[in-house]
Amino acid sequence: MDSFSSLFMKLCCISTDKTGSKKSDRKNKNKIKDYMEHDYYKITIVPGSSSTSTSSWYYTHA
């Protein structure tokens, strides 16, 4: 659980830092770059073990 929490915070920070805000992410959803960031946000919301979630988000929009 600790590992997942760290991963959650890390990805959340990365996602927020790159997209700037939820509005930006939604507005530029058409761009491939933002699509990738959207996946980052997705994993943070999806509950489960870090291993499973990490693998899942990698193939979400691959």
Swiss-Prot record:
The lineage of its organism: Viruses, Varidnaviria, Bamfordvirae, Nucleocytoviricota, Pokkesviricetes. This is Protein A37.5 homolog. Belongs to the orthopoxviruses A37.5 protein family.
